[in-house]
């Protein structure tokens, strides 16, 4: 079996400029994903998909390969990671580089480690699902969620659950925004991962942080330090 890791990292991040290579406790953010992929020992190649020369330069420095530059039409605010992965697989196939399994690993997942990737890969192989992705449990019952209308009035999505005990409600999970394993065939044929053909690798909440704002970035640093107390 040949395994490929694709790290999508476009250059046009808006809320955190240069997010993928911003300093994170002394190293570019993307370096953590590259090093975890390399140290996991499960990938034959770690390939960057980027439209940005500086990101490519940083990724090469930390051990990834960049055999192509991502097209600009796959690099705007509306471009999906799935489209970027499909594009990368197709380019590599045109170069006679064929892989059985492909992992999309986000550049913004510094809280992971090599063992998590290894365990997730093993579960993916055992489950024989089309995809396996990282997820985590919502910290509050989503059945009790509410929204505000245009007049700032409160409406519950479903009032019948208001008095239910938390332990009686079905647990809900969300995408951790970290990694997605899939067969090459599934990546090329499917445009939506979140279906019964997928399985999940559940991460504890202290290993999950969606880094979209500077506040998120600082919180991720705190989590990293807590998770690696002996190193600080």
Swiss-Prot record:
Family designation: Belongs to the CMP-NeuNAc synthase family.
CDD domains (UniProt xref): CMP-NeuAc_Synthase
InterPro entries: CMP-NeuNAc_synthase, Cytidylyl_trans, Nucleotide-diphossugar_trans, PseF
EC number: 2.7.7.81
PANTHER family assigned: HAD SUPERFAMILY MEMBERS CMAS AND KDSC (PTHR21485), N-ACYLNEURAMINATE CYTIDYLYLTRANSFERASE-RELATED (PTHR21485:SF6)
Name of the encoding gene: pseF
Alphabetized UniProt keyword annotations: Magnesium, Metal-binding, Nucleotidyltransferase, Transferase
Coiled-coil spans in chain: none
Requisite cofactors: Mg(2+)
Swiss-Prot/TrEMBL catalytic activity: pseudaminate + CTP = CMP-pseudaminate + diphosphate
Domain of life: Bacteria
Pfam name, any one: CTP_transf_3
Protein name as it appears in the record: Pseudaminic acid cytidylyltransferase
Role this protein plays: Catalyzes the final step in the biosynthesis of pseudaminic acid, a sialic-acid-like sugar that is used to modify flagellin. Mediates the activation of pseudaminic acid with CMP by forming CMP-pseudaminic acid.
């Amino acid at each position: 079996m040949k395994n490929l890791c694709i790290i999508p990292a476009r250059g046009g991040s808006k809320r955190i400029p240069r997010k993928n290579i911003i300093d994170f406790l002394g190293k570019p953010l993307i370096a953590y994903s590259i090093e975890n992929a390399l140290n996991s020992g499960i990938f034959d190649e770690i390939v960057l998909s980027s439209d940005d020369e500086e990101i490519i330069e940083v990724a090469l420095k930390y051990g990834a390969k960049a055999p192509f530059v991502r097209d600009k039409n796959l690099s705007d605010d509306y471009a999906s990671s799935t489209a970027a992965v499909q594009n990368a697989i197709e380019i590599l196939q045109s170069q006679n580089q064929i892989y059985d399994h492909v992992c999309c690993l986000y550049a913004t997942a510094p809280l992971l480690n090599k063992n998590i990737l290894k365990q997730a890969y093993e579960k993916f192989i055992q489950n024989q699902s089309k995809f396996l992705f990282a997820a985590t449990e919502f910290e509050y019952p989503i059945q009790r969620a509410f929204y505000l209308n245009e007049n700032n009035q409160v409406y519950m999505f479903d009032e019948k659950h208001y008095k239910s005990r938390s332990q009686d409600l079905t647990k809900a999970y969300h995408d951790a925004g970290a990694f997605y394993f899939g067969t090459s065939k599934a990546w090329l044929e499917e445009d939506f991962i979140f279906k019964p053909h997928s399985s999940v690798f559940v991460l504890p909440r202290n290993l999950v942080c969606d880094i979209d704002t500077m506040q998120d970035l600082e919180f991720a640093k705190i989590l990293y330090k807590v998770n690696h107390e002996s190193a600080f």
